[in-house]
């Protein structure tokens, strides 16, 4: 077991052991590190979002198996077993973007277990899990170590939970191993709970009446609930992963709008507060603390006049001049807690505040929250940490589990059965044909043929009219531009300066508009149902595109989902830190720049997670999903070719063919 204070180098050593820090850009390496054995190594990182590679649950677990050349016939049993071992009972095609942080962490652990590693490296693997999840993972890891004889290296600040499993404890400090006993005190006994109760006051600070919460503003999460928090009271939101603790916490903080019911903070709706007014009464720490920072140094974040004093109380003195995003996870959380628990707040809302904290940071957290309660602040924290709840004497509000359900069912369409490459050909062939000429006949025939096929193509495509809007707008604007400024011929209808509307310009405008519709409509409708994963499978298996290039691109697309989530949380914190009243341009620029920086960090972590699951180890891969190109798919290509041939043929037969080139 690796332990030590935040920033001591535990995660770096874990990555080195996993063999994923080889590039010169990763840092300077001195000495030698030898890992015996050629079997796969499993690595689970701290942040769940940084290691979800694929868009669907089973595909994500299969990722490492494909890279390791595991036969497809063996994958299903491995995937099912690994997911069962971590208690993640979801549909095979359940979108990974809809998982909570704890569910993502279970998925990452399942991905590592499925590879049957000889060396399993876990970097704070259970910090985001609910108690049932922690117990299930601990039992699974214990069984694997016992039955399979794998070597386990675990990084955790809570050594007690691993006391029955680890044989040796290594303590790091400032990147060096320091002498420590084989069984330090924290392995044998947890800090005694003090059950300290706070002198609550009568006044109600926060209340929720018939509150219905929603993350996306459209789908209700759980049942309506009622809640009241008084001054000086600490309330812990509990419940399993995915129960809605984060959503409820951010709704209570005035950062998310309720779907129903009402939230009242000091007699007012917190959602109606200005950003500055809200920041003066509410302090917020998100689950990922990096979203809390807006300045280039810890000193500037804390305020230069009070930085030394606050940094000393939170153990941040040695890093005052460091950039907040360069800190370790535990250091970032301590800084975020320091920022949220300043003077003036009446309510603190904390999402997993003890996650990634070392023993010193945890002790400071407990002291600070107790002091805040004694001063009359209301404290709401979403947490899985039983010991923290016990030490704080918090009142628990337990959210029931929310049924995961099945993956969203959408109406079936003929497009769902088509190979993506066939659909690509069906859209590309008529487009190439129409690009060879610009005339009214070919464009008109093509639009008529496409229109006749819309009932077949658009069946099962939701909101296809909305999807077509960009094409229609492009068509309309192009037609107007050419009608006013195109080459004039024939009868002149209107002339004013550079504007000339003639018979020829109107004919050309109509032909251009119809051609844009004829080219754009099939592409939009055909690709509206193409799944990115199926398209990647078709490219690698049917088109023989480079495997690693295709999969890397697919992982990059999934990163957009993570970045979209980052943008949402960042916007919460812009409001929570009192910066949401600025002009739209300044807010957008601020959020965009930070998201860009976070995206770079995310991509680095994602690349590390992919490498840990054998990505790039072999030139070829096996495939969990088989991409087929049955005979019926040639009908799509034939249909596209027919549209192109009939359109151009009609123009030639009528003498209207107007070659674009030559």
Task: Please provide the spans of the model-predicted regions.
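ABC ATPase C-loop
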Residues: 112-113, 340-341
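Catalytic Walker B motif of ABC-type/P-loop ATPase nucleotide-binding domains
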Residues: 120-124, 348-352
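Conserved ABC transporter NBD signature motif
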Residues: 26-39, 261-269, 278
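The feature captures the beta-strand-to-loop junction immediately N-terminal to the Walker
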Residues: 3-5, 238-240
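Conserved ABC ATPase signature
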Residues: 95-99, 103, 323-327, 331
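Transmembrane alpha-helix interface motif
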Residues: 408-442, 446-452, 565-662
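Helix-to-loop junction immediately C-terminal to a conserved catalytic motif
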Residues: 18, 253
């Amino acid at each position: 077991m690796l332990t030590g204070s935040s920033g001591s180098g535990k995660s770096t050593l874990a990555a080195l052991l996993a063999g994923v820090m080889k590039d010169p850009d990763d840092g300077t390496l001195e000495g030698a590190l030898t890992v015996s054995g050629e079997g796969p190594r499993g690595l689970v990182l701290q942040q769940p979002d940084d290691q979800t590679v694929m868009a669907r649950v089973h595909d994500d677990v299969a990722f490492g198996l494909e890279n390791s050349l595991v036969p497809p016939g063996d994958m299903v049993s491995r995937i099912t077993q690994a997911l069962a071992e971590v208690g993640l009972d979801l549909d095979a095609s359940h979108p990974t973007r809809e998982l909570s942080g704890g569910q993502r962490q279970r998925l990452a652990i399942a991905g590592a277990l499925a590879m049957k590693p000889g060396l399993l490296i876990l970097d704070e693997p259970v910090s985001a899990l609910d108690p049932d999840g922690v117990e299930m993972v601990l039992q699974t890891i214990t069984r694997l170590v016992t039955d399979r004889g794998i070597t386990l290296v675990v990084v955790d600040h809570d050594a007690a939970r691993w006391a029955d499993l680890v044989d040796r404890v290594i303590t790091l400090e400032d990147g060096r191993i320091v002498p420590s006993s084989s069984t330090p005190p924290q392995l044998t006994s947890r800090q005694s709970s003090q059950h300290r109760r706070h002198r609550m006051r009568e006044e109600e600070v926060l209340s929720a009446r018939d509150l219905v919460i929603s993350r996306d503003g459209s789908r209700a999460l759980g049942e309506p609930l009622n809640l009241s928090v008084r001054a000086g009271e600490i309330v812990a939101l509990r419940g399993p992963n995915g129960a809605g603790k984060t959503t409820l916490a951010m709704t209570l903080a005035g950062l998310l709008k309720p779907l129903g019911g009402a939230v009242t903070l000091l007699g007012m709706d917190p959602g109606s507060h200005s950003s500055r007014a809200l920041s003066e009464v509410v302090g917020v720490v998100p689950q990922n603390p990096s979203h809390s920072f807006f300045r280039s140094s810890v000193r500037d974040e804390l305020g230069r006049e009070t930085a030394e004093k606050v940094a000393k109380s939170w153990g941040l003195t040695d890093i005052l001049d460091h950039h907040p995003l360069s800190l370790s996870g535990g250091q970032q959380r301590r800084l975020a807690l320091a920022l949220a628990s300043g003077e003036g707040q009446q309510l603190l809302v904390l999402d997993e505040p003890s996650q990634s904290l070392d023993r010193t940071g945890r002790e400071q957290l407990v002291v600070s929250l107790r002091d805040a309660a004694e001063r009359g602040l209301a404290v709401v924290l979403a947490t899985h940490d039983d010991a923290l709840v016990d030490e704080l004497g918090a009142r628990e509000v337990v959210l029931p589990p929310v049924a995961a359900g099945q993956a969203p069912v959408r109406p079936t369409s003929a497009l769902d059965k088509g190979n993506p490459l066939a659909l690509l050909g069906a859209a590309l062939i008529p487009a190439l044909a129409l690009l060879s000429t610009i005339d009214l006949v070919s464009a008109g025939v093509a639009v008529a043929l496409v229109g006749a096929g819309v009932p077949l193509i658009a069946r099962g495509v939701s909101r296809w009219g909305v999807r077509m809007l960009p094409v229609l707008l492009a068509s309309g604007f192009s037609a107007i531009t050419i009608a006013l400024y195109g080459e004039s011929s024939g009868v002149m209808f209107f002339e004013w300066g550079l504007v000339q509307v003639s018979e020829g310009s109107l004919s050309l405008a109509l032909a251009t508009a119809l051609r844009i519709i004829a080219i754009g409509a099939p592409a939009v409708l055909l690709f509206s149902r193409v799944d990115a994963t199926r398209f990647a499978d078709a490219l690698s298996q049917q088109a023989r595109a480079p495997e690693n290039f295709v999969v890397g691109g697919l992982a990059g697309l999934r990163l957009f989902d993570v970045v979209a989530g980052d943008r949402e949380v960042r916007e919460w914190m812009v409001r929570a830190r009192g910066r949401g009243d600025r002009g739209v341009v300044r807010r957008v620029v601020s959020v965009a720049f930070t998201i860009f920086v976070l995206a770079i960090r995310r991509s680095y972590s994602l690349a590390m997670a992919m490498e840990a699951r054998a990505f790039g180890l072999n030139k070829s891969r096996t495939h969990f999903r088989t991409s087929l190109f049955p005979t019926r798919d040639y009908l799509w290509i034939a249909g596209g070719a027919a549209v192109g041939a009939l359109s151009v043929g009609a123009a030639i037969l009528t003498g209207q063919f107007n070659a674009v080139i030559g």
